[in-house]
Amino acid sequence: MGKTFIVRAQYLLTMNKKDEVIENGALVVEDGRIKDVGEFTEILKKYKDPSIPVYGNSYSALMPGFINTHTHAAMVLFRGIADDLPLKQWLTEHIWPKEAKFLSPEFVHDGTSLACIEMLKSGTTTFNDMYFFTEAIAQAAKKLGIRAVVGQGVLDFPTASGKGADDYLAKAKEFIEKYKSDELILPAVAPHAIYTCSRETLLKSKELALKNNVPIHIHLSETFHEVEECLKNNGKRPVKYLKNIGFLEGRITAAHSVWLDDEEIDIMAERNIGVSHCIESNLKLSSGIAPVAKMIKKGVKVSMGTDGAASNNNLDLLEEISIAAKVQKGITADPTVLDVKTCMKMLTIWAAESLGVEKEIGSIETGKRADLVLMNLRKPHLQPVYDIYSTIIYSAKASDIEDVFVNGILVILNGRHQFIDEDELIDKAIWWAERIRNS
């Protein structure tokens, strides 16, 4: 950091409270933060030093980096290993047995690294991760230059990474202490789900998060079976159960939230619980379709997650949001729901608010971190442009992302990572696949 530069574009989408779009806009970055925003001609008048680099051009769109609010990055190494199965069978017969055999810091580091480069190249600058061996996740993210909210997975049973709930919580506490002041890594506590965590474990997770002012990340009501089990075991639906035991406090991102009734949605809105909508994973596993339009109407902050690439099978938020918008229009028979501006908010500022980092990222405003994405609009499938939001949400592809900045550092230039050998990461993935395939 310490570098000053200008980024210009034909369209600058601020995602501020006024949803301002500046045509022929530009911004100035200094010491990793946005120093100034305005029209390109005015910016050039104010910053006349010819040595200041200028990125972008007159045929691009500049926007805040996308935020993936639910994923398991390292699971990219299980991409395509088991498809076309219901969630429970997919987990118990394929994913969990493979994790038991291969889960290690090396596996997590290599998988996370591959996921990070996939996310960066598709415009994601921050991801909210729930997994194990958090040190390996953090090191991979920092090496790749991406921002990450890293949640230590918490379960009641042992895995290759821990002996049980108290062990996972101790690891979470240690990780929080180490990374609480890091510029790229935000620690979190991630109790896996109601069906894998006891009441005591859920409450201990919440207390640890509240004490350290870090986010909570949990799977919630992903399948109807999960709701039935909660009713059977606890006498209440999942959201009502969590409210009843006193869990719903702090900054919570609830992944999936597919099977919520109206009362549960009201509770989510009341308690300011963020929802990470993972439409592709939910569709592929036949888990159901979350009532996103209804949630948004009732004031729930909904953002987008990809889930892990093992169930998606990619980490492309542009694809995710386009499908989400169309599915909601279809199931509600209302073409006005999830309009293109709402969709952009779900990728950016609403996601930041869900994670409690809206003062730092999520919009292009002075003082915020320079997490930025430049999209090349000079493509046949992106022209003509009448509404830039529409072009991005309904027409753009991950491959249209050309340049990506994180924390004021140019990480992706012309679609290539600037300081990592992509081929090396691909070769490692192939090596892991051979081991897993032959096991």
UniProtKB/Swiss-Prot annotation:
Family matches, as Pfam families: Amidohydro_1
Positions of substrate binding: 99, 192, 222, 307
Keywords, comma-separated and alphabetical: Hydrolase, Metal-binding, Zinc
GO terms for MF: 5'-methylthioadenosine deaminase activity; metal ion binding; S-adenosylhomocysteine deaminase activity
Cofactor note: Binds 1 zinc ion per subunit.
Catalytic activity as recorded in UniProt: S-adenosyl-L-homocysteine + H2O + H(+) = S-inosyl-L-homocysteine + NH4(+); S-methyl-5'-thioadenosine + H2O + H(+) = S-methyl-5'-thioinosine + NH4(+)
Enzyme class: hydrolase
Amino-acid positions noted as binding Zn(2+) in the UniProt annotation, renumbered to this chain: 70, 72, 219, 307
Main function: Catalyzes the deamination of 5-methylthioadenosine and S-adenosyl-L-homocysteine into 5-methylthioinosine and S-inosyl-L-homocysteine, respectively. Is also able to deaminate adenosine.
Official protein name in the record: 5-methylthioadenosine/S-adenosylhomocysteine deaminase
Organism name: Thermodesulfovibrio yellowstonii (strain ATCC 51303 / DSM 11347 / YP87)
Name of encoding gene: mtaD
